[in-house]
UniProtKB/Swiss-Prot annotation:
Residues 21-44, 104-118 have a biased composition (Low complexity). The active site is at D1390. Residues 45-67, 127-139 have a biased composition (Polar residues). The keyword Phosphoprotein applies. Its EC number is 2.7.11.25. It comes from Saccharomyces cerevisiae (strain ATCC 204508 / S288c). Residues 1-70, 97-155, 190-243 are annotated as: Disordered. This is MAP kinase kinase kinase SSK2. SMART domains: S_TKc.
């Protein structure tokens, strides 16, 4: 097939003759207007051979293979990219792109101008009209070669769209083009608009030549398809000529290539596409960067310290005590240490050698070494001069004048029956009537039977089960006896009469026996029922096999191995659901809660009777019901872990999803273990918890922290995108801090991970600061400089403040260890013995090393595990009374422990979202509690909460019950005379098991339980020990946690040091661009506050604190210098700044700090203070003289204020408030209950199952491991959810179609099959991708591409799109997708804004093909795809076949009339036999959508109902067109072409792509690419 044949192939019977070969091979010097393509390959013969083998689709992006329109994308390739339009105006660089949010809909401030669709990367020139090309004068641009497409290995794997190419009936011949053409760019389409535009406009120099295989040289470009005779190639403006269709198709193919190429070259959103890579080690780049230059910092510190023997390099010796005093005043905060001050007194010797006060070396060293240093310094006159000046400054600044002026400035910003016998008679008469007797006979019969009942009562009193009787046998025996009792009971009208006649039945022993037997039978029946229900639930959720059916009733779940296998499969199945907590509540906790509660209640109440009857306890059944959810959640965690660990470099979106999953699973696991452990207390019943359960939860925690680290540290290393990282840490700290109390080995893990993450955040903050100081960004103007400076202030201030708060929380939570020095060994041992302490013998391992453990009296008689928990720091970080927030029916399990009394009972209700729940009610005072979502809340008026006194009593009781362990390391031999406790042989403690570094002659106190009890335990121990010990330090007993906290303190110091030391770099950088004094003054204010916060909050030794104080003193001098030299003295603001700066300087040089300044610094300080005082005096308003004069002037010039605007503002606020309240009420009314359908085993006799098997056997049936997320909306016949693919973490959309019965399946099956068949063959960026189908017994899931941006209808709810260029871009994408559909033989038939979605890049996607139909070659609708075999093996047609050329009857016409009336074409409503071109009805619908985008109103918005709309459309009317102010004339003509009544005259989608209005936006989008291509090829 020749190249010309590709462009003259006529799939719809075009009778136009093909151009001759000679015309297709014109020379490059031809003067005709031509379209130019890239070279057609190196070997044309090979290319032609490939072309002959199979047709390919327009828009194919690779030249390596060829596909039809239903070809599959490469795995992982994103089907759509953002349209990036760039400006072509002179003076603007090519390829310059605006930010996605840079498009402003209009200059107005309405909500309509801030809509989402504008975020598509469209750059707007300052004058859009000048940027548009003139259609009649533009030369034909050329294009460049298409770059090689990415290989499949370079693309992130993603579920590939499923396309069916095997069924010949489903394959539609489409426009066939050459393989080389499939990857070409398009040309400027403006030349195709009018006949006069197709002229000789391209010179020969734009047409490069290439060598042909035969050695000849010719022009092998797409311009060869255009003949020299322009009249033969004329294109009517509305596509009226015969040849125009062919030309449109050719141009459509060319334009499609460039369009698809632009889609693929989009800039992806990092949230969905960027893989987050974990750091290879803990010392990440941020820490390394912040450590860069540490040597320089230490050298500076050496120069500042001048203290010998100071260990400055030890991270773990940076201020041991984490106690932050809350009583520090400002004076004490800024006091330097005496040792540091000694190193700063050299100025006394070097100040002036001529003065007689010079000090000799020997005298100087004697002064510094003396104990009365301060008194000797006061004898020096120069020191006295400084203190005198300091006193004078303090008096001035604290005087009345300055205080009054400050008050004035501060105030400037402030503004101004029947009786018993009668009822018995009725009962007797009814009884006689029912038995056909007289009343007398009935009375006689009852007396005889009543006299014979004594034997039954005696049997009950003597009843006792035999030993070793099985539960089933016992149930039969008990049931027989109980049935006798109830038959006897019917002989009396009520129990009260029976008690009166038979006193034995009134005894407590008899009633207890009856109650116990009834309860036992009820428990046996309900336990068996619930166990069978759970097993059926497990087996019933197997996925439907596509070929065979499995009888799930034959599965033996009593076999533990079989049950474990099915349980794992079941866990994997329910993991797909979006809300695991809700599933556990509805399916497990709610049905089991009352019976589990009653099981414990009745046993404790009737335990004595239980033993008398020799009843066996149903402990195995109860254990199964308790342990089943724990086993299930364990399997869920393990399965989720296996999937999560397979994902390499997850995106931020995947990380968020996994964090939500694992936090939910861990929370459920902890709640269930706590509930089971509490339930088993106080009675004989015990369960054995899986020893691997805790390990699984810890493993889940470890992975959670690994992805939390990625989530917090994901952003670029140059800046912080948000300051939410500490908030995220605080959120999960509140969630997990008590987990260590319930899960073994979790406490220390949580503590270590939180401190590690906090440390890394502080390092990142320091690294960010250093980057801004040393390598600031290029600031082009004053606005950029101001934005940069404000960003630094916000990030440093906000992050430091939040991190400080979180660090303080961690520090207090992890302080569980205090170290004392032993002063009197013998007295200490004596006191410990007398107060009941005991020696804990660990097996000799610790004792051989000189370390001994001594327990407090509270621990005597405790379990070994309790002591080991103290040693292992298991409860580190927990609350004093650890509690869990349980918002489900697990709270009912242990209701006996929560204010249960004789008046208590269970009540049930259903929440607003359909979730059932139980609550405890008291018959005397109760009202039902409300249920809000998954949270149970008591109404405040009826809440039986404990008083404050009771809560304090609980805390006090808990505190008194806690003990402590002393780790004693004496220098002397230990002779213990008190009590001793031996640990079990398997519980011995070895030195390496003691996570503590001991030092000789010390005693370490490790408290039990929460770290918040440490203060209380320390006070107790110090009262016991007296003066025999002295305090050394308080810290965490975990070495890892302690070291991390020490490193955090050092990181805070280094960050503060950098702020104060290098503030001049920030000032210099800012002053180069903007000399705004207000912002420069804020730099000094920020430095002051940053330093003071460190001194008040953070921990450091005295020498390090002194360094910060000295730097702050230098900062104060620099601040005063700035005010005196750079600021305008007449500015009122400078007065306020001077007062603040001098007060800061006075505060910093107070006390002995003033001696740390050298003479030069002190002189500069005095000079700048004098200048600032002069400035203050010029602003002083003595006795108000100046203010009175200014007030007189202001009164003369003051005008009356119009308060009308104020009232108008108040009215608008009230209206807005009412509108919001109304919206909230409407939203609450729309909340519906979500019923749940229970699956059934498939039945061969059910006709509906044939449909399921047909769908399951489809080639697009996939086996995908996924998990449901949020509800999105409803489609034509299903509900749509977002979901995550567990194999790769990608987000999908899942249309869930519920199947009620066979009739509903027969009704919706054709629609499902039709939509699947349509989606399988489609593959285009503007059509939602289809990934496959998953078939179950009660529902069908269809997997499709997820569109994050929502629907176009939701977008238009905010108003019209005021920017016409944005409307053009959307229309272009809509036409591209519609043209592809029609070229593939698909008619959508329901085009409307609700079926048009936008992905996360704002690109249009067609969706919901439930109403679409596929047209075969002969123009008839395909029906074979909707045939299935019935029960007799014959084919049954489940759809109606209609001819597109003639409608046979009204029934078929009504079936073809599908869509939404306000968007339906006239021929669709009237059932006209004149259908016009293929897809003409879609074009009408498209015009209605464009009309709505322009006007913001739905078509026919002025009509009341759909019948009126259909009447007007059928009558030949058209919707109301927009005004001239809303759209240009070109856009108006485009709408006219779309909304032509006659479908034969209505333009097709391909023709509309050549409309000037669309050509205009295409020219702006792709014009520059064409011109740049020409330059590259000529080079």
């Amino acid at each position: 097939m020749s190249h010309s044949d590709y462009f003259n192939y006529k799939p719809y019977g075009d009778s136009t003759e093909k151009p001759s070969s000679s015309k297709m091979r014109q020379s490059s010097s031809s003067s005709s207007s031509r379209l130019r393509s890239e070279s057609l390959g190196r070997n044309s013969n090979t290319t032609q051979a490939r072309v002959a083998s199979s047709p390919i689709s327009p828009g194919l992006h690779s030249t390596q293979y060829f596909r039809s329109p239903n070809a599959v994308y490469s795995p992982g390739e994103s089907p759509l990219n953002t349209v990036q339009l760039f400006n072509r105006l002179p003076g603007i660089p090519q390829g310059q792109f605006f930010h996605q949010n840079a498009i402003s809909g209009s200059s107005s401030s309405s909500a309509r101008s801030s809509r989402r669709p504008s975020n598509i990367g469209l750059p707007l020139p300052k004058n859009p009209q000048q940027s548009l090309p003139k259609l009649s004068t533009q030369p034909v641009p050329v294009h460049k070669k298409v770059e090689a497409s990415k290989t499949e290995s370079e693309i992130i794997k993603k579920p590939a769209p499923v396309n069916s190419n095997q069924d010949p009936l489903l394959t539609t011949p489409t426009l066939v083009i050459s393989p080389e053409l499939a990857s070409l760019n398009t040309t400027n389409t403006s030349i195709m608009s009018t006949p006069q535009n197709i002229t000789n406009q391209t010179s020969n120099k734009h047409i490069p030549t290439r060598s042909q295989p035969n050695g000849s040289t010719s022009s092998s470009t797409l311009q060869d398809i255009v003949t020299t005779n322009s009249s033969q190639r004329s294109v009517g403006h509305h596509g009226g000529s015969t040849t125009s269709l062919r030309t449109y198709k050719k141009q459509y193919v060319l334009n499609e290539q460039l369009y698809l190429r632009k889609m693929r070259n989009r800039a992806n959103d990092d949230y969905y596409t960027r893989g987050i890579v974990a750091s290879s080690n803990f010392e990440d780049d941020e820490e390394n960067f912040s450590n860069k230059g540490e040597d320089d910092l230490e050298l500076e510190m050496d120069d500042l310290l001048k203290v010998e023997g100071e260990d400055k390099d030890n991270d773990f010796n940076f201020g041991y005590n984490f106690i932050t005093s809350s009583t520090k005043n400002n004076e004490n905060v800024v006091s330097m240490s005496l040792n540091y001050l000694k190193g700063k007194l050299d100025w006394l010797r070097d100040v002036n050698n001529d003065q007689p006060c010079e000090i000799e070396d020997e005298e100087w060293h004697s002064i510094l070494g003396s104990e009365d240093l301060l008194s000797k310094l006061l004898q020096n006159p120069m020191v006295n001069n400084r203190f005198e000046w300091q006193t004078m400054l303090s008096k001035v600044l604290k005087g009345d004048i300055v205080r009054n002026e400050k008050t004035k400035i501060a105030n400037q910003g402030k503004g101004p029956g029947f009786n018993t016998q009668f009822s018995d008679d009725i009962w007797i008469e009814l009884k006689a009537w029912m038995n056909g007797r007289t009343v007398e006979d009935q009375n006689k019969s009852l007396r005889i039977f009543r006299d014979s009942t004594d034997s039954v009562f005696q049997e009950i009193m003597a009843f006792k089960l035999e030993d070793n009787m099985s539960a089933d046998e016992a149930a039969e025996t008990i049931k027989s006896l109980v049935d006798k009792y109830y038959r006897v009971l019917n002989l009396w009208p009520n129990i009260k009469r029976m008690h009166a006649e038979k006193p034995i039945t009134k005894t407590e022993a008899f009633r207890n026996r009856i109650d116990t037997l009834n309860s036992w039978l009820n428990f046996k029946f309900n336990f068996d029922t619930n166990i069978a229900y759970l097993k059926k639930w497990i087996v019933g959720n197997k996925e439907l096999e596509s070929t065979t059916e499995v009888d799930n009733t034959t599965v033996n779940l009593d076999d533990p191995a079989v049950f474990a296998t099915n349980c794992k499969r079941f866990a994997e199945q329910i993991m797909k659901e979006k809300d695991i907590e809700l599933i556990f509540q509805k399916k497990i906790f709610f049905p089991l809660a009352p019976w589990i509660l009653k099981a414990k209640f009745f046993f404790l109440k009737y335990q004595k009777t239980w033993n008398e009857l020799n009843l066996s306890y149903l402990d195995q059944d109860l254990e199964f019901l308790l342990m089943f959810p724990m086993r299930l959640v364990k399997d869920i965690i393990l399965i989720r872990l296996s999937y999560a660990k397979k994902i390499q470099n997850p995106t931020l979106m995947m990380i968020d999803q996994m964090m939500d999953d694992f936090s939910t699973y861990i929370k459920l696991a902890v709640q269930m273990k706590f509930t089971v452990a509490s339930y088993c207390n106080d009675w004989f019943f015990k369960v054995k918890i899986d020893p691997e359960f805790d390990h699984t939860v810890v493993e889940g925690l470890e992975y959670f922290f690994s992805i939390l680290e990625l989530r917090i540290l994901y952003s670029g290393k140059n800046s912080f995108k948000t300051s939410k990282e500490p908030d995220l840490l605080l959120k999960y700290w509140e969630m997990f801090r008590n987990v260590g109390y319930y899960i073994d080995d979790a406490g220390e893990l949580i503590a270590a991970e939180f401190t590690k993450l906090t440390l890394r955040l502080v390092h990142r903050l320091h690294a960010y600061l250093l980057r801004q100081q040393n390598t600031p960004p290029k600031l082009e103007n004053e606005a950029a400089a101001e934005k940069w400076l404000v960003q630094i202030f916000e990030i440093l201030g906000s992050m430091k403040r939040k991190l400080n708060r979180f660090t303080n929380i961690l520090t207090k939570a992890f302080q569980n260890f205090v170290r004392y020095k032993i002063e009197d060994h013998n007295y200490l041992l004596k006191q410990l013995k007398e107060t009941g302490h005991f020696l804990i013998y660990t097996g000799g391992y610790l004792e051989q090393n000189g370390t001994y453990l001594i327990g407090s009296p509270e621990l005597l008689g405790c379990k070994d595990d309790d002591i080991l928990r103290i040693i292992k720091n298991s409860d580190i970080g927990c609350d004093l009374v650890p509690k869990l927030e349980i918002n489900n029916s697990l709270t009912i399990y242990n209701a006996l422990d929560d204010n249960w009394n004789s008046n208590s009972s269970l009540g049930s209700d259903i929440s607003n979202d359909g979730t059932p729940f139980y609550y405890i009610k008291n018959d005397l005072t109760t009202q039902p509690r409300s249920y809000n979502g998954n949270r149970v809340n008591r109404e405040p008026d009826f809440e039986n909460s404990r008083s404050t006194e009771e809560e304090f009593y609980e805390l006090e009781t808990r505190l008194n019950s806690l003990g402590y362990v002393l780790v004693l390391t004496p220098q002397e031999p230990l002779l213990w005379e008190g009590e001793m406790y031996n640990l079990s042989d398997n519980k011995t403690i070895k030195p390496e098991g003691l996570n503590l570094k001991v030092i000789p002659n010390s005693i370490d106190l490790m408290c039990q339980g929460s770290s918040y009890a440490l203060e209380y335990q320390c006070d107790r121990f110090q009262q016991i020990s007296g003066s025999s010990v002295s305090f050394l330090e308080k810290k965490s007993s975990s070495e890892t946690v302690k070291n991390n906290l020490q490193r955090i303190n050092k990181a805070y110091f280094r960050c503060t040091y950098s702020v104060l030391k290098n503030y001049t770099k920030i000032v210099t950088t800012f002053k180069k661009v903007s000399p705004v004094n207000d912002l420069l003054n804020n730099i000094f204010l920020f430095g002051r506050d940053f330093g003071l916060n460190f001194l008040r909050i953070n921990v450091a030794n005295n020498e390090k604190r002194s360094i910060i104080i000295l730097l702050m003193m230098r900062l104060s001098i620099g601040w005063l210098k700035f005010l005196a030299e750079d600021c305008d003295p007449t500015d009122q603001r400078v007065f306020r700044w001077c007062v603040t700066s001098m007060e800061f300087a006075m505060h910093m040089v107070s006390g002995w700090n003033i001696l740390a300044l050298d003479e030069c610094q002190f002189s500069s300080l005095k000079q700048k203070i004098s200048e600032c005082m002069s400035l203050l005096i010029s602003h002083f308003d003595i006795i108000g003289a100046r203010s009175i004069e200014v007030e007189k002037i202001n009164q003369q010039a003051r005008s009356n204020l119009d308060l009308e605007d104020v009232f108008d503002d108040d009215m608008m606020l009230q209206v807005n408030s009412e509108f919001r309240v109304q919206s909230i009420m409407e939203l609450e009314e729309r909340i519906k209950r979500n019923p749940h359908q229970t699956g059934k085993v498939i039945d061969d006799s059910d006709k509906g199952n044939k449909y399921l098997v047909s769908l399951a056997s489809s080639i697009s049936n996939v086996s995908m491991r996924w998990q449901k997320r949020n509800f999105i909306g409803g489609g034509t016949f299903g509900r749509v959810y977002s979901a995550v693919d567990l194999d790769n973490g990608e987000i999908l959309a899942v249309k869930e179609i519920n199947i009620q019965d066979s009739k509903s399946m027969q009704k919706i099956f054709p629609l499902i099959k039709e939509e699947m068949s349509v989606l399988e063959i489609l593959n285009h960026p503007n059509i939602v991708s289809y990934y496959g189908v998953e078939v179950h017994r009660d529902k069908v899931n269809i997997f499709m591409e997820y569109c994050e941006g929502g629907s176009l209808a939701a977008l238009l709810e905010h108003g019209r799109i005021e920017d016409e260029m944005v409307t053009q871009v959307y229309t272009l994408q809509l036409l591209e997708g519609l043209a592809y559909l029609h070229e593939s033989g698909i008619v959508h038939r329901d085009v409307k804004p609700e079926n048009i979605l936008l992905d996360f890049n704002g690109v249009i996607k067609y969706v919901d093909f439930g109403a679409a139909k596929k047209i075969a070659n002969n123009g008839t609708r395909l029906a074979s795809m909707n045939k299935i075999e019935n029960a007799d093996g014959e084919h049954e047609d489940v759809t109606h076949v209609s001819d597109s050329k003639a409608v046979k009857n009204n029934e078929n016409a009504l079936l073809d009339m599908m869509g939404t009336p306000m968007y339906m074409a006239p021929e669709s409503i009237t059932g006209s036999t004149t259908k016009g071109k293929l897809g003409a009805d879609d074009v009408w619908s498209l015009g209605c959508v464009v009309l709505e985008m322009i006007t913001g109103r739905r078509p026919w918005a002025n009509l009341d109902n759909e019948w009126a709309i259909m009447y007007h459309v059928a009558a030949g009317h058209t919707p109301q067109f927009p005004t001239k102010d809303e759209v240009s004339s070109a856009g108006m003509k485009f709408l006219e072409r779309c909304l032509i009544q006659n479908p034969s005259k209505r333009a097709s989608a391909v023709e509309l792509l050549m409309d000037p209005w669309i050509v205009q936006i295409r020219e702006i989008a792709f014009g520059d690419d064409s011109s740049s291509t020409d330059t590259e090829e000529r080079e």
